[in-house]
Amino acid sequence: MRHGNSGRKLNRTASHRKAMFANMAASLITHEQIVTTLPKAKEIRPIVERLVTLGKRGDLHARRQAISQIKDQDAVRKLFDAIASRYATRNGGYLRIMKAGYRQGDNAALAVVEFVERDVDAKGAADKARVAAEAAAAEAA
């Protein structure tokens, strides 16, 4: 019997699930929007919302708790500096999950997970370099 066992297993071991959610949370904090399958999106929401609440607390212990969960110093820095201040007056509900159709290869239900008041220009370093190169090429042409 599975009484009281909440959460989806997603056909992964516990360590794989933990690592996957840590990577997804870091990507979501860095890019402020990700596309994933609907069950993964529903599972990542409480994890990231808890991290944003830690960011709003802002003390050293909260920062260490966040680092122990996502292992990405840059994402934690952005979480505590930019994202926490953005949601200082909001009590929960920091993420939005929108259904995004079905994946062509296996017909899996997709979803877009994004921050409610997200920064549209938030991109990772690779994306910033690519956008800058495209802009420079467009001006040169």
From Swiss-Prot:
Pfam families: Ribosomal_L17. One of its GO terms (biological process) is translation. InterPro entries: Ribosomal_bL17, Ribosomal_bL17_CS, Ribosomal_bL17_sf. PROSITE patterns: RIBOSOMAL_L17 (PS01167). It comes from the Bacteria. Keywords: Ribonucleoprotein, Ribosomal protein. GO terms for cellular component: cytosolic large ribosomal subunit. One of its GO terms (molecular function) is structural constituent of ribosome. Part of the 50S ribosomal subunit. Contacts protein L32. PANTHER family: LARGE RIBOSOMAL SUBUNIT PROTEIN BL17M (PTHR14413:SF16), RIBOSOMAL PROTEIN L17 (PTHR14413). Belongs to the bacterial ribosomal protein bL17 family. This is Large ribosomal subunit protein bL17. It comes from Agrobacterium fabrum (strain C58 / ATCC 33970).
